[in-house]
Amino acid sequence: KLTQVLYHRYKAGKKGIIMLACELIDNNGKELLKCVNQYIDQWGLDDGFRKYVNEDCTFCGSLVDRIVPGRIRDPKEVAELEQKHGYADPLLDVGEVFGVWVIEGDTKLNDVLPFRKAGLESRVFVTPDMSPYKKRKVRILNGAHTGFVLGAYLAGFDIVRDCMHNDTVRGFMNKMLHEEIIPTLPLDKK
């Protein structure tokens, strides 16, 4: 569908657009561009369109980490949400609010994307290289979850939120983070 949308924009003489790839795979922006180019080949689309895609459009990689555990199974909670919002959603899901979204691209994107205007400059970052952010995310977030999950599960906890409300589990995780995980990162100590 994306290739079709871009092709229609190209044929209509519209300027290129910015794509923010959010798939949780390495090099997601480059992989998305690769997919579009593969469709250009498969469908025999013209070289002018290929040039438009590769030069006028921007394919940014990004790092978004958001835990989406799945459907809400408690009928009472579903009913409360349906009442609150005024409609029934058969695909109702729950997800944690993510704290940071890192977009890999030219920092000039800050002038085009509306994140600053929305007051999100402390939560959305545009950077030419997101690899340091990925390393931090993988080690800190995934390391913390991996490090405390077994003990938390044995203590009877099923979700991260409940673990963080428990002083013992939260204390263990914080100690592990500060003594074992964060020292392995090339971070500014501030």
Describe the function of each predicted region.
Residues 1-190:
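Substrate/ligand-engaging "lid" and interaction regions
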